[in-house]
Amino acid sequence: MGSVSNLVSPNICHPAPPCLTSRSNKFPWTKPISGLLFYRSVTPIKRCHLVRRSCVVSASLTGNLGRLKRNVQDFTSMNYWVVRDYYRLVESVNSLEPQIQSLSDEQLKAKTAEFRERLARGESLADMQAEAFAVVREAAKRTIGMRHFDVQIIGGGVLHDGSIAEMKTGEGKTLVSTLAAYLNALTGEGVHVVTVNDYLAQRDAEWMGRVHRFLGLSVGLIQRGMKAEERKFNYSCDITYTNNSELGFDYLRDNLTSNREQLVMRWPKPFHFAIVDEVDSVLIDEGRNPLLISGEANENAARYPVAAKVAELLVKDSHYKVELKENSVELTEEGISLAEMALETGDLWDENDPWARFVMNALKAKEFYKRDVQYIVRDGKALIINELTGRVEDKRRWSEGVHQAVEAKEGLEIQADSIVVAQITYQSLFKLYPKLSGMTGTAKTEEKEFLKMFQIPVIEVPTNLSNIRIDLPIQAFATARGKWEHVRREVEDMFGQGRPVLVGTTSVENSEYLSELLKEWGIPHNVLNARPKYAAREADFIAQAGRKYAITISTNMAGRGTDIILGGNPKMLAREIIEDSILSYLTSEVLADNIDDDELSQKVLSKIKVGPSSLALLARASLMAKYVGKSESKSWTRKKAKSVVTESLEKSQTMDPMELQNLINEQSEMYPLGPAIALAYLSVLKDCEAHCLHEGSEVKRLGGLHVIGTSLHESRRIDNQLRGRAGRQGDPGSTRFMISLQDEMFQKFNFDTEWAVRLISKITNDEDLPIEGDTIVKQLLALQINAEKYFFGIRKSLVEFDEVLEVQRKHVYDLRQLLLTGENESCSQHIFQYMQAVVDEIVVGNSNPQKHPRYWSLAKLLKEFMAISGNLLDESFSGITEETMLQSLENLHEGSSIEMEDLSLPHLPKPPNAFRGIRRKNSSLRRWLDICSDNLTGSGSYRTLINLLRKFLGDYLIASYLNVVQESGFDDGYIKEIERAVLLKTLDCYWRDHLVNMNKLSSAVNVRSFAHRNPLEEYKIDGCRFFISMLSATRRLTVESILQYWSSPMESQELFIS
């Protein structure tokens, strides 16, 4: 079933390359292969086909030439050989199917424990891959009624091998993920299945989770708004479903917490294996936007409204220049003068009265941040629209004052400015996984980027059925008016035929413009965009988008992850009927922003006609819901009411109608709402399936779903995602792109619109008529390729810069986790190391191994040493002067007989309880002293003297600290918590400041390119210098804080950390 083994020709004249006769976790083509070697390896195949071509040329030449060319390309494609190799896995899985089918449910469940025992005995996952896949296939068939096709087995193998599986829309990627997720979860180290939003994560956890739970694995779900305890439990499960942003923020939050009980991930190894759904969206589209956690900064919010008024005074091109491609503005001399005059300041860049940043942000808000395109205003707040998905991200804010500038432009309350306290890019986040895989319908065009950035190949998995979608030629218009009018006509034409239509737009503004246009012509339709009144019903709209006469206008969100099934999705439609009948009796809440009053809304479309038995069951379920609602005073929230319906629908999947009816009869006096809803759902579902099957056949006869793209995107891949909505699983369908030369993309990337207008004028005098053909398509393709290269350059630069920061971040986060989760003694060891390191810096910074101590800065050395100790050394070192220390060093240098075991220097005080302190210190400092002891001071006659001095002062400081801690009377647990708190707080404080400095540096180094210096190399050098300085400052503040804490009066002890 579902086999595509006919793709493997029986007439192959050349065996598979040796490197492809067995699979491994990393494929050989991830390494650089010279073009010469590659073409030599495939030359025999080409020869073979040339021979075959000579045999068939005498037949119908015209009919065979295209197919022959395609066959040659198949056999010379590396992808062909890889897929061919995976058919060995398919054969193994298929051969095991009869044996697995014969197992009882209990025997099938017991396979999980058996696999884990075999792993413990030394077998590898590869040894049991085929059998595990066969077990999952059978479990899916028994639990959710779905059997993996052969091509889906290939997809599972690709995922397990740590590659990206490109599978076209409707090929069942969600089901494919169960294979690799189950196999890798057997190790007990945790598997993350990552989706692009909460809805898909919840859907997959509930739907595919049934397969895993049936086999005895635990399944977790991470959702926005969950508490730390819930997150911790769900991350501890064998398989965890989450979305990419929640995963990233949980990682960052775990590295900000000061309480080990608040850690939610599986530390010390939170990452094992991830399957990323829509991997191109996560790693490429979202790759330009790093994840940021911000804290409030002390900024003057009153400046933003003033700057917004100044921006309104300034005129584009006269007072400032705009670079659309770079999203940057530059003030002219005239603009600077006018701004300074309006603000009554002599210099916009005055450090004591800085206005430049506020004015530049106000101009950016004016030119680049458009309402209903980049953001919407709701409840007095400016909410970001993700331009790639079309969804509102209400928890996200633009950084560096841009969001405040937008709020000022809109006259909204200005929220507190922010500074970054933690950040990471998605590229760096997913590189933390030892094994990473992904799946999507559109990755092949970005294969080079995946290979270069992640060393992950893209494998194109064959479709189960041939693709018969028709992609109509692109139509180009000189004006936007002409484009929208032709879109309207095409929608009207398709509506007249009864074909469903999906229109893709790039913004809320465009979707609502087209909606108004269709309303004027009386064409009923649904709108799906970021506005909450539409977004809340995204899945419902997409479920009906394949029905006869359905017209759906959508932004880029386009319901990714939800298939558009011709004739409608019977399960979604049946659920909608149940909810319409039940919810109003259980809750008094209604959907905010009700859209059903619009007479042109297609919410109901043509209502599914349910049979008499279904109507009776619906009436009974409604009656019970009415009774339950009355007894509860309709106090349930809509969310709780929907969860009751969801639980009931899940029950319908595990019980047959007879069992449900018996349950209702047994509990009739208790008004068993759940069984009644489940029974009604099964009956309604049967009616919906019959209706959708009939309507789907009718839609197929008419030509299937028609997709209209109203603008080219900045990547061919995103255009292909929209095209992929039509023609799923061998269905008929068609697509058409209509573009205007006034579209923003042409302005942003400096397309030669004058050339295009001249070309159009040669063909027609009507500027509202379209042109199409190879000439214009080639130009548009070149434009998209340039855009792809540009954004690839941005992502590449972001990754390269973040790789520098990632080294530093890993050091800080590893240290943090060691302090947070390590033994109590590790905190003391770090305190001792920091004390010795700070003393080393003081001594080395004020001495010279080539000069006599009388030429050292002994007064400064002594002052700095006393300053770090608070009041701890006031009594013992009160009589020590520069002369005393000089005399001690001279005596020591002349005597040369004192050893460090004496733990003292002439004329200087002996450490209290010295031997006890040093014994404890030596165990912790051994590695530190081995590494840096004799390499800090350089060469010279007085090198040994410097080493003795810094070791003595370090010993003295540590011994004094241990003495005062012991005399405090506090127990060890309290002392270690104080140490941990000081260590974490100082580290966080300086890491936060370091991130601010590094962000400033990343902007500043670009200017150095004008001096022919490499910005990345400059960033590495200065960033390293900043990091070393940060670590030094962290150590010093830690030592100062901990010593000041213990040396201050007990009634006023505080952590002196700003």
Curated annotation (Swiss-Prot):
UniProt xrefs under Pfam families: P-loop_SecA, SecA_DEAD, SecA_PP_bind, SecA_SW
EC nos: 7.4.2.4
GO molecular function: ATP binding; chloroplast protein-transporting ATPase activity
Subcellular localization(s) per the UniProt record: Plastid, Chloroplast membrane
SMART domains in the record: SecA_DEAD, SecA_PP_bind
Transit peptide residues according to the UniProt entry: 1-58
Phenotype of the disrupted gene, per the record: Embryo lethal.
GO biological process: intracellular protein transport; protein import; protein targeting
Binding site for ATP: M167, K168, T169, G170, E171, G172, K173, T174
Gene Ontology, cellular component aspect: chloroplast membrane
Catalysed transformations (reactions): ATP + H2O + chloroplast-proteinSide 1 = ADP + phosphate + chloroplast-proteinSide 2
Keyword Membrane in record: yes
Keywords: ATP-binding, Chloroplast, Membrane, Nucleotide-binding, Plastid, Protein transport, Transit peptide, Translocase, Translocation, Transport
Membrane topology according to the record: Peripheral membrane protein
SUPFAM superfamilies according to UniProt: Helical scaffold and wing domains of SecA, P-loop containing nucleoside triphosphate hydrolases, Pre-protein crosslinking domain of SecA
Gene3D superfamilies the UniProt entry points to: Helical scaffold and wing domains of SecA, P-loop containing nucleotide triphosphate hydrolases, SecA, preprotein cross-linking domain
CDD domains: DEXDc_SecA (cd17928), SF2_C_secA (cd18803)
InterPro entries found in the cross-reference section: Helicase_ATP-bd, P-loop_NTPase, SecA, SecA_CS, SecA_DEAD, SecA_motor_DEAD, SecA_preprotein_X-link_dom, SecA_SF2_C
Record text on subunit structure and interactions: Part of a second Sec protein translocation apparatus. Interacts probably with SCY2.
Other comments on record: Cannot substitute for SECA1.
Function comment: Involved in protein export. Probably interacts with other proteins to allow the postimport or conservative sorting pathway for inner membrane proteins in plastids. May have a central role in coupling the hydrolysis of ATP to the transfer of proteins across the membrane.
Protein name as catalogued: Protein translocase subunit SECA2, chloroplastic
